[in-house]
């Protein structure tokens, strides 16, 4: 690539982003679910109260402010979901909690929390009630929550009209941000190999919000993935993303897990030791995670 610097327009490296799978249970069975595929025999588990308390205490000791994304599985159906929100939102370094939900559950009775946001995921082949999905979004927006909808760009051509219709419906909802979400292949290291007719059908997405800066030019995910603007191998990446699994193990997102795993029950000072974001050298030929595409990356002079 001709560029020397890449990042999200609002990216701040002086905090950490934590992704937490407090359970590996979901009402849906999406064929492309990377979490279900990667967890294998660990799918169908719920974090124990001991693990949850250990994770919360480790975040309580964090030196840097943190954002927490609750994933899974489907986080809202977990028996400790509200307990987690109660505890996390009272921590000193807490900034935001992002709940990633398929909105299969009725959320209209959800209690209020400050600095809580919802990332609604629309799965076109699996969503059982699109009307309930939309009603949940409208309800949470009406209560003042920040909301964004991740619309999964399924490769099945028969689903494309439904995807386009959902995008158009969401466009008509004031205050709702829309994020077309691309699918992974067999692992999160590889994007699904979309056909030419997919890119042609969804070409209108090129005009959507552009929030990824490549030097002084702005692009969106559609353009970046279509034009393969994802090779940052050898660049310095200010990766501040960490993921916690259902067993309380934490790794730096995107690095291999073999030599990179720490259990937070045994080491509650893990986040305390992270005092600033130290850049890592990107080892990959393609960055296919929309979250990591937001991180500051700087080309190193050869």
Regions found by a protein language model. Give the residues of each.
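Residue-level signal for mature regions of secreted extracellular proteins and peptides
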Residues: 19, 23-26, 68, 230, ...
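Short cysteine clusters
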Residues: 26, 30-33, 237-239, 253-254, ...
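Cys/His-rich zinc-coordinating "finger/knuckle" motifs
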Residues: 33, 37-41, 244, 261, ...
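Radical SAM/AdoMet-radical enzyme domain recognition
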Residues: 56-69, 78-169, 176-178
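A C-terminal junction/extension of Radical SAM enzymes
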Residues: 171-258
């Amino acid at each position: 690539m001709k560029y020397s610097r890449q990042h999200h327009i609002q990216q701040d490296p002086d905090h950490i982003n934590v992704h937490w799978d407090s359970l590996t249970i979901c009402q849906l069975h999406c064929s492309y679910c990377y979490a279900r595929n990667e967890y294998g025999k660990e799918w169908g588990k719920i974090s124990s109260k001991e693990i949850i308390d250990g994770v919360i205490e480790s975040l309580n000791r964090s030196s840097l402010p943190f954002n927490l994304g609750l994933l899974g599985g489907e986080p809202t159906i977990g028996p400790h979901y509200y307990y987690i929100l109660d505890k996390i939102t009272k921590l000193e370094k807490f900034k935001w909690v992002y709940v990633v939900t398929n909105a299969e559950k009725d959320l209209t009775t959800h209690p209020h929390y400050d600095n809580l946001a919802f990332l609604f995921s629309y799965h076109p082949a699996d969503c059982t009630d699109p009307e309930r999905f939309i009603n949940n979004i409208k309800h949470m927006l009406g209560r003042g929550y920040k909301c964004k909808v991740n619309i999964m760009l399924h490769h099945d051509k028969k689903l494309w009209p439904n995807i386009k219709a959902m995008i158009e419906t969401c466009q008509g909802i004031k205050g709702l941000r829309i994020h077309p979400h691309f699918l992974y292949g067999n692992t999160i290291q590889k994007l699904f190999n979309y056909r030419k007719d997919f890119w042609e059908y969804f070409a209108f997405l090129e005009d959507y919000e552009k929030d990824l800066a490549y030097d002084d030019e702005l692009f969106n995910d559609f353009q970046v993935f279509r034009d393969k603007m994802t090779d940052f191998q050898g660049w310095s990446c200010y990766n501040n993303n960490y993921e916690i699994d259902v067993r309380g193990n934490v790794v730096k997102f995107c690095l291999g897990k073999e030599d990179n795993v720490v259990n937070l029950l045994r080491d509650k000072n893990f986040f305390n030791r992270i005092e600033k974001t130290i850049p890592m050298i990107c080892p990959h030929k393609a960055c296919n995670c929309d979250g990591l595409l937001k991180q500051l990356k700087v080309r190193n002079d050869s």
